[in-house]
């Protein structure tokens, strides 16, 4: 046998093969890192820009075993794989459905039944003991995690670790588990920024929830108590911190990553798969809309067209310079403030999303001068204040929240939300999809959710009237806007394009 793959622990497998084959495998499991050209280590010749997932100790992330078969097929090798690696949970769909039917699950005071795609995700995860469960925002990922955790505690000894991206989500996840009536507060220990005084005394709690920033600081022996690990919003999980957490969880048989939008790029995908196993995507956002599970979505892609004189001056600026100039335009910010007020005056709630604090504060001040019910949220606003604003939006009408992408694009859930205005045009697929997800949650006060995507059209027009090209030069924010429209088309979202002359 050319390659032998041995079980090492629940985080890694060990490769046994000849030296020349090992180097071929190491190349096969190496990928160019995203943005490596901009990394100082690459620029100074200290790194070749590649991420290598097979290390010199011949250890490969557990989830990548399936890729070894592809390697063998491509290069004509034969492999033996330790049977322990492919062990599955002995659970039939019939037994799973029977177990699920006996659970009494609630949302508030109303008894609920998990949706078909939630059931499929839980079953797929349990049987395989690891999976990336890729479901759209608003598909009820916290219920999926609660059911996975409940099954584990009923059938295994050991604790469950849930990693979330923000302190606000630590509290939200714990509250959701209790709301479903699948767990009591005493069974859940919050650690780090989201913890309360009571959490100190919950050392026997079987479920531990914390941010990766808190978890990564724990001593190595702390990780040995966990038999199941779930990483919520796992698209934020690339990098050394999460890899070191996964490596510490070498006794942990069940590992799940949950996300609504995985990062593109082979290196990213392979890192996810290595940590959590294969990707399982049971449902799309467009299917959820079709089935009436989330609010219908309309995207207004508004091209803000600038005068020719301005576009010529903008040409040749760096990306950062362009952002600074455009977000600093008084006329543009006044237009955004006017739009937000107009939406709020219809008794509908609107979020205005910004990236840079100076831009957010400028928009907030313009709205505040004309309208009372406006609030500002960014990383500098503490979690408690954010939660108060979340409650205000959930229970109020005609409220405007000027919010940073960093705080509100990931995980904060407000159902009573009608409009999202993208005041800063971002390139990141993840931020765009997560932000859209915030507006899709169903609420009795809305039949349609609207995203206002502002695209700064400062392309330079050709001097000759005979040329077929509309623009001879595209500015960065226009290019990013066109990319977002392509993303909407890929996701089968309903979008319209309009032009507004500034």
UniProtKB/Swiss-Prot annotation:
Keywords: ATP-binding, DNA-binding, Helicase, Hydrolase, Isomerase, Late protein, Nucleotide-binding. It comes from the Viruses. SUPFAM superfamilies: P-loop containing nucleoside triphosphate hydrolases. Probably interacts with UvsW.1. Interacts with gp32. A motif (DEAH box) lies at residues 232-235. The gene is uvsW. GO terms for molecular function: ATP binding; DNA binding; helicase activity; hydrolase activity. Pfam families: Helicase_C, ResIII, UvsW_N. Plays important roles in recombination-dependent DNA repair and the reorganization of stalled replication forks during viral DNA synthesis. Active on in vivo-derived T4 DNA; viral DNA is highly modified by hydroxymethylation and glucosylation of cytosine residues. Helps process Holliday junction (HJ) intermediates to mature products by catalyzing branch migration. Probably able to catalyze replication fork regression. Unwinds HJ and Y-branched but not linear double-stranded (ds)DNA; unwinding requires ATP and Mg(2+). Unwinding activity is strongly stimulated by single-stranded binding protein gp32, the ssDNA annealing activity is partially inhibited by gp32 and strongly inhibited by ATP-gamma-S. Another study did not find gp32 stimulation of helicase activity. Holliday junction (HJ) branch migration is inhibited by ATP-gamma-S. The keyword Ribonucleoprotein does not apply. Residues 335-501 form the Helicase C-terminal domain. It catalyses: Couples ATP hydrolysis with the unwinding of duplex DNA by translocating in the 3'-5' direction; ATP + H2O = ADP + phosphate + H(+). The keyword DNA damage does not apply. Residues 122-280 form the Helicase ATP-binding domain. ATP binds at residues 135-142. This is ATP-dependent DNA helicase uvsW. Its EC number is 5.6.2.4. Its cofactor is Mg(2+).
């Amino acid at each position: 046998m050319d390659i032998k793959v041995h079980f090492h622990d629940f985080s890694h497998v060990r490769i046994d093969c000849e030296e020349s084959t090992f180097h071929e495998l190491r190349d096969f499991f190496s990928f160019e890192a995203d943005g490596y050209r901009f990394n100082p280590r690459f620029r100074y010749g200290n790194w070749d820009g590649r991420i290598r997932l097979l290390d010199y100790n011949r250890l490969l992330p557990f989830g990548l075993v399936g890729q070894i078969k592809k390697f063998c097929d491509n290069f004509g090798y034969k492999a033996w794989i330790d049977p322990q690696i492919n062990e599955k949970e002995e659970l039939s769909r019939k037994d799973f459905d029977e177990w699920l039917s006996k659970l009494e699950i609630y949302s508030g005071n109303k008894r609920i039944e998990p949706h078909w795609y939630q059931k499929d995700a839980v079953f797929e995860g349990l049987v395989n003991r690891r999976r990336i469960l890729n479901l759209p925002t608003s598909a009820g990922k916290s219920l999926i995690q609660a059911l996975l955790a409940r099954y584990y505690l009923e059938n295994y000894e050991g604790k469950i670790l849930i990693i979330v991206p923000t302190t606000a989500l630590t509290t939200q996840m714990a509250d959701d588990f209790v709301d479903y009536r699948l767990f009591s507060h005493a069974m859940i220990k919050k650690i780090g920024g989201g913890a309360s005084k009571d959490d100190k005394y919950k050392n026997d709690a079987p479920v531990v929830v914390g941010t990766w920033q808190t978890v990564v600081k724990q001593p190595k022996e702390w990780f040995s108590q966990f038999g199941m690990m779930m990483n919520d919003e796992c698209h934020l999980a690339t990098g050394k911190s999460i890899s070191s957490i996964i490596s510490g969880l070498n006794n942990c048989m069940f590992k799940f990553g949950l996300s609504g939008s995985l990062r593109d790029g082979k290196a990213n995908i392979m890192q996810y798969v290595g940590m959590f196993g294969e990707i399982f995507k049971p449902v799309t956002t467009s299917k959820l809309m079709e089935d009436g599970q989330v609010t219908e979505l309309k995207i207004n892609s508004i091209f803000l067209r600038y005068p020719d004189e301005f576009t010529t001056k903008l040409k040749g600026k760096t990306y950062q310079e362009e952002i600074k100039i455009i977000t600093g335009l008084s006329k543009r910010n006044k237009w955004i403030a006017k739009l937000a007020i107009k939406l709020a005056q219809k008794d509908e709630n609107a979020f205005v999303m910004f990236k840079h604090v100076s831009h957010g504060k400028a928009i907030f001040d313009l709205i505040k001068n004309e309208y009372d019910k406006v609030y500002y949220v960014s990383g500098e606003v503490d979690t408690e204040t954010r939660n108060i604003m979340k409650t205000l939006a959930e229970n109020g009408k005609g409220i405007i929240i000027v919010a940073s992408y960093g705080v509100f694009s990931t995980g904060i859930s407000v159902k009573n939300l009608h409009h999202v205005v993208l005041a800063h045009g971002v390139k990141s697929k993840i931020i765009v999809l997560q932000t859209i997800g915030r507006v899709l949650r169903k609420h009795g006060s809305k039949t349609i959710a609207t995203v206002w995507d502002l695209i700064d059209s400062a392309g330079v027009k050709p001097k000759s009237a005979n040329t077929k090209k509309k623009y001879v030069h595209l500015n960065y924010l226009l290019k990013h806007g066109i990319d977002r429209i392509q993303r909407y088309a890929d996701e089968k979202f309903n979008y319209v394009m309009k032009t507004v002359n500034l």
